[in-house]
Amino acid sequence: MASNEASTSAAGSGPESAALFSKLRSFSIGSGPNSPQRVVSNLRGFLTHRLSNITPSDTGWKDSILSIPKKWLSTAESVDEFGFPDTLPKVPVPALDETMADYIRALEPITTPAQLERTKELIRQFSAPQGIGARLHQYLLDKREAEDNWAYYYWLNEMYMDIRIPLPINSNPGMVFPPRRFKTVHDVAHFAARLLDGILSHREMLDSGELPLERAASREKNQPLCMAQYYRLLGSCRRPGVKQDSQFLPSRERLNDEDRHVVVICRNQMYCVVLQASDRGKLSESEIASQILYVLSDAPCLPAKPVPVGLLTAEPRSTWARDREMLQEDERNQRNLELIETAQVVLCLDEPLAGNFNARGFTGATPTVHRAGDRDETNMAHEMIHGGGSEYNSGNRWFDKTMQLIICTDGTWGLCYEHSCSEGIAVVQLLEKIYKKIEEHPDEDNGLPQHHLPPPERLEWHVGPQLQLRFAQASKSVDKCIDDLDFYVYRYQSYGKTFIKSCQVSPDVYIQLALQLAHYKLYGRLVATYESASTRRFLHGRVDCIRAASTEALEWAKAMCQGEGANVPLESDREDEEESRKVKFSIYSKDHLRELFRCAVARQTEVMVKNILGNGIDIPLLGLREASIEVTGEMHELFKDESYIISQCFLLSTSQVACSTDSFMGYGPVTPRGYGCSYNPHPEQIVFCVSAFYSCEDTSASRYAKSLQDSLDIMRDLLQN
């Protein structure tokens, strides 16, 4: 993983790294002289000697050291099963001909015959016996042998570090939990304290190596899963760069440091709250609550208007990088930035958005389940994703921070998280664990919070005229982006995964086909579709892409629409109810439609399984593309091809975010002309978070949600007995 300063060097590369890992592997886990405690002591001594001889440019070792899971150095029983190279396999490099065959198959439903034929010719040249493809493939195989995860930094840079657009909406998801009922400001402080106490307890569990090992629950069940991303959630932060971003990840020394703090932001004012210190130990919940209460009472009373520094983190990455450089010209600002980066989390204490903020919906939709006053679930999701703009809470954020807990005075709460360090599953599981503990052990009457502690330190920013001007410019830029977001939380309540499973279909596969049908009903075509597939069966595995737009799905969608083509009238659009009750004559029999559906299910399942077992196409294609640049100095024509560009423009970006609580997570589209759609299947309902941009006349979040409703309805009619 990236070190404090280095961001893009290949994981575990270079002779120094190889020597270090050779040294580490010579230690054995057991009792006596080679006990874990002795290993730690020996390791520290070895590193002290190693560091004394290191040069400033020698950074490859950092990635390897920081990639060692903490639990490997613990006394827990299954240490040898936890993310270490000897037990977790490396990400594979699939055979070249297999990747190219699957690539052609993925292009068939989303390209024209002429485009596809051109691509096939390029692939023939690329894959010829004397072509460059075999050479590049061997380059990746060699890279796999030399490194812990040959694809990690290719993928990290492609997905995150090289992207220059703003984080909110475009990259950072927002998550909404069931709202609380706060009667007083003390309730807000106590709830915040309980969340932070849970974060601190989780930190202690990581440090002690007690994080339970997860195993695969499907397809070659019981395989151990890489847990590395769980160790990157707390105390980490993204750093902007003019050309490329980097990551701040806590070093082993910092993980063992007894000082723990969070940064609390209230009304754009920032405070450092120490949760645990070497000179006084861990704060109790009541003591933490007293610190939060101080912030809640102090921030509104300050005479000067606060400097909304957090607003700058919502700007395009290169712009924010230059602003950050200006901030760092003052040493006091440098210290503030360090406190934010090293904080376990950022806690944002918000004011509520107006009830009519960006209000959306459609006639016939089911009512929202959760409300906070006059605010519905869509409104609450806006607050978590972007804060509502410069007049609301967008300056009350630090969008670079991996985890921002957000609590609003009206009971709305959730989080916004920066995506580069971890996938959603690690974030969701951490917050749901803390939330369930709070629900299972309600607040006891602790009386008023204790006030014997010194107050939190308020971070004061020192900015010149140039930065003052940038705040005004950033306000306009951020507000424009937020005004363009078309976002809608839609609950489909006719059925959920209980019915889907009764049809002998995976709920994820079923919903993915519903998303394809909904798109076809509106546009008469399928488009490149992204669904994240976890590759945590492999060392430092993150995700690959399940491409749901298949030829089989296209044939089924065409048949389901009875050949009507694009902009099929939706049942929920019809004003005349009698019209919708008329008998409709089908071109295809139900048996034929069911057979097409089963074929689409089989193909979607096949693609899903290939991806989770490390045999997808997007990671290998990315590797071949980057290898062509590294080996020949230029990108091969195959990756400049129109079909490749189409395949990488994900007009439908989707992901299943399964929550055991009645929570949901949403995000914006990944392209100006596309949709974002997360989903959370429950036994008797499915929650969708649909997003689009108003600046695109061809897309509409509410209309896509309506098409989803109709698609799910007719799929039930097709499959139920």
Curated annotation (Swiss-Prot):
InterPro entries (UniProt xref): Carn_acyl_trans, CAT-like_dom_sf, Cho/carn_acyl_trans, Cho/carn_acyl_trans_2
Any one GO molecular-function label of the UniProt entry: choline O-acetyltransferase activity
Catalytic activity: choline + acetyl-CoA = acetylcholine + CoA
Keyword Protease assigned: no
Record keywords, A-Z: Acyltransferase, Neurotransmitter biosynthesis, Transferase
Leader sequence residues: none
Cellular component aspect of the GO annotation: cytoplasm; cytosol; neuron projection; nucleus; terminal bouton
Residue numbers marked as site, Cleavage: K584, F585
Active site: H419
PROSITE patterns: ACYLTRANSF_C_1, ACYLTRANSF_C_2
GO terms (BP aspect): acetylcholine biosynthetic process; neuromuscular synaptic transmission
Binding annotation for CoA: 496-508, 534, 656
PTM description: The N-terminus of choline O-acetyltransferase 67 kDa and 54 kDa chains are blocked.
EC class (word): transferase
Subunit structure: The 54 kDa and 13 kDa chains exist as a heterodimer.
Family note: Belongs to the carnitine/choline acetyltransferase family.
Function, as annotated: Catalyzes the reversible synthesis of acetylcholine (ACh) from acetyl CoA and choline at cholinergic synapses.
PANTHER family named among the record's database cross-references: CARNITINE O-ACYLTRANSFERASE (PTHR22589), CHOLINE O-ACETYLTRANSFERASE (PTHR22589:SF14)
Protein name from the UniProt record: Choline O-acetyltransferase
